[in-house]
Amino acid sequence: MEYRLKAYYREGEKPSALRRAGKLPGVMYNRHLNRKVYVDLVEFDKVFRQASIHHVIVLELPDGQSLPTLVRQVNLDKRRRRPEHVDFFVLSDEPVEMYVPLRFVGTPAGVRAGGVLQEIHRDILVKVSPRNIPEFIEVDVSGLEIGDSLHASDLKLPPGVELAVSPEETIAAVVPPEDVEKLAEEAAAEVAEPEVIKKGKEEEEE
C-alpha cells in the first residue's frame, strides 16, 4: 500500500518561517540524492497517521516527479509534541531495510487455558526490494501453549523478504496469569516515547 503527499523544493526559505506558515521542513535523500523539501503539516499528519514508517509515501513534486519514499525520522517539538522536521528516504531498485507490521491471527491454546498473549513486537525489521514490500506479515499464534514463545525464525516471510534481525528475536509469548501484573509494571516503567521516531539522515538548520 502506498500513500501520496505533495512536496515542494526549498529554495532558501527558513525552516522557522515555514513552520509559522503551517509547513513542515524536511529532506529527501538516498545514496545519490540529497534535496531540501517541505510539505503541508496538516496533510503530512493525515498521511503519516496511516502510513507511519511501514508504508510507501509517494512525494508529488512541482516538476512532475513522483518519488516513492519511506519516512526515516521525524523530529518533534519537545513542548508541543508536533513535528518539526521529517526525513524521507527515496526508494530505488536497491533492497531497503524497513519495519513491516506484524498481524497476529488465531487464539493461542495457552490463552484458552488461562494464559495471556504477550505481543513483544508489533513490527519486524526486514530487508526487501521496494517492489516486494508487503503490507503486513501474518503471524499464526494459535499453537502457542503457556510458556511457549515464537521467534523471528518462525515467521513465514513472503517471497523476496529477508530478516534483518537475529532469528532468535522473540516475537510473542504466552505467559502464565500470575506474570501479567509483573509485565504491566515493567511496561509502565519503560522509557517514554523518544523524540526521534526512527533514525535517518540528520540536517542542521538555523
Curated annotation (Swiss-Prot):
Xref: SUPFAM superfamilies: Ribosomal protein L25-like
Pfam family, one: Ribosomal_TL5_C
CDD domains attached to this UniProt entry: Ribosomal_L25_TL5_CTC (cd00495)
A GO-annotated cellular component: cytosolic large ribosomal subunit
Keyword Cell membrane: no
Domain of life: Bacteria
Gene Ontology MF terms: 5S rRNA binding; structural constituent of ribosome
GO biological process: translation
Region (Disordered): 184-206
Residue ranges, compositional bias (Basic and acidic residues): 195-206
Keywords recorded for this protein, A-Z: Ribonucleoprotein, Ribosomal protein, RNA-binding, rRNA-binding
Residues in the signal sequence: none
Record's keyword annotation contains rRNA-binding: yes
InterPro entries referenced in this protein's UniProt entry, alphabetically: Rbsml_bL25/Gln-tRNA_synth_N, Ribosomal_bL25/Gln-tRNA_synth, Ribosomal_bL25_b-dom, Ribosomal_bL25_C, Ribosomal_bL25_long, Ribosomal_L25_dom, Ribosomal_uL5_bac-type
HAMAP family: Ribosomal_bL25_CTC (MF_01334)
Stated role: This is one of the proteins that binds to the 5S RNA in the ribosome where it forms part of the central protuberance.
Assembly information from the UniProt record: Part of the 50S ribosomal subunit; part of the 5S rRNA/L5/L18/L25 subcomplex. Contacts the 5S rRNA. Binds to the 5S rRNA independently of L5 and L18.
Similarity comment text for this entry: Belongs to the bacterial ribosomal protein bL25 family. CTC subfamily.
Protein name, entry field: Large ribosomal subunit protein bL25
Organism of provenance: Thermus thermophilus (strain ATCC BAA-163 / DSM 7039 / HB27)
Gene: rplY
